[in-house]
C-alpha cells in the first residue's frame, strides 16, 4: 500500500529528526494493541455455552509391576535378620486376588458434554460466566474444573451446589471452591457407569510395590485415577465412620490386606476387636502368624467386652515396657530402636528384642462405648496419646459417628479420618469437622482427611473369597506356632493410675483434712 509505505517513511524520517518521536510512536502502538486485546477478551467471555470447548482427559493407570509377588517394604540387609527363624516365609502372591477386566476409567463423551452444557447453563442463569471448563474422568467420579470469568465470587458458585445437583439429576455432587493450589473451581459429578477399583490393581502398582512406607495402607484410587496410599506409622491413628452398607467393612479389609502383603510375621502383629463376632472371623486362620493376644485368651479375635478391656490395659503395659527399653537403648522411636538391635548395638541381657509393629483394629466402636464406657475410652485415649513412638497404632470404626460415641478426647488423638457415606450433615461434621460425607454416593465412595482438605477416594474392593485365599496361603507358610503373648494387664486401680495408698508416708494433717472435707452423717443420710 503506497499510503502505508509513505506513512512509514515519514515516521522513520521524523524519528531521525526527533529522538522522542520513535518512543511516542511505540507508546501509541502499545496502547492500541492493549485496547484491542481487552476488547477481544471481553468478547470471548460473552460467548454462548456451545462455543466453550472442553478437554476430557483420563489420567493414565498406575504402571503395573511385572512380578507376581509383592516385595517387602524394606529389605533389611543387616547382621541380624529380624525375619529369623522364618526366613523362608513367602509373601502372598497377587494371583490370590481377583483381576477385573474392566479396570480403566470409561469415557462417555455424550454424558460429559451434556453435563458440561448443564453446568454452564445453570451458572449462566445465575449470572456466573466462565472462561474454560475441563473434565477429568475417574473410576466413579468426574471432576469438572472451571475457570470463572474475572470478578466472579467463589462463594456465589459454592451456593449453587443444590441447583447444579438438581440440573444434573445426580446425587453425590460436591463443589471444591477453590481447588487447592489452582486458580480453578471443581465440581465433582458421579459417573453414570462406575468402575470397580480392584485390590489387585492397587497392590500390583509400582507405587505400592516400591514404597518405603513403614506401614503402607493402600486405600484405593483418587479422581485422577492415582493409587492413594498413606503410612499408618505417620498418621498415626485412624478413625473410620460410615453408615451401614456404605463400604466401611470393605475398607477395613483393604487396610488389613495391604499390611499382610507388605509385612513379615516378625514385623507386624494385629489385635482385632470385633464385638459383632462376624467381621474379622475370617482372619482367625492366621492367628499364629500375625495376631497378638493376652496369654489366657482362647479366641484370637476378641469379641467379649470384658476381654476387650483386659486387652487394652495389656497394651498399656506393653507400651510402658517398650518405653523403658527405648530409654535404655537411647532411641527416640521404634525405628531407631530396631535399627540398633539389628546392628548389634543393644545387649540382649538387658531384655532387648526386636519390636514388631502392633496395629489394633476395633470394629463397631460405638457398641463398646455404649456397654463399657470409660473403661474402654480411657485406655484407648492413653494409647493414642503415647503409643506412636513405640509402634502401637489404632484404627477404630463405627457406624454411628455421634458426639456421644466419638468424644472430643477420641477425636483429638485420632488425626487421620476416613468417612464413608453418612446419613446426615451432623454426622459428617462429627467425623470430618465439615459437611461432605453426607453427599457421597456410597459403594466405597469415601473422603480421607489428615490435614486441611479432604481427598475423595474410591475404596479398593476386596471380597471374602479373596481374603480366604490370602489367609489360607499365609497359614501354609512357616511362622510362629502361637500368637504373640501380650503382658498381663495391670489391675484396675493401677491401670487408671491409682492403686493402694501407703498411709505411712501421708502428711500429718491428712486425716484432719479428710474429716473436714468428708460429708457429715446427716449429709450422707
Where are these regions (language model features)?
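Conserved phosphate/pyrophosphate-binding and hydrolysis machinery centered on Walker-type P-loop NTPases
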Residues: 105-116, 137, 150, 154, ...
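Short glycine/threonine-rich loop-to-helix capping motif typified by GTGT followed
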Residues: 146, 341, 408-412
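Hydrophobic side chains in well-ordered alpha-helices
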Residues: 115, 157-160, 255, 311, ...
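Short catalytic/ligand-gating loop segments at beta-alpha or beta-beta junctions
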Residues: 328-337, 487
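Conserved alpha/beta core segments of nucleic-acid transaction machinery
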Residues: 450-518, 522
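Low-complexity, intrinsically disordered P/S/T-rich segments
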Residues: 1-237
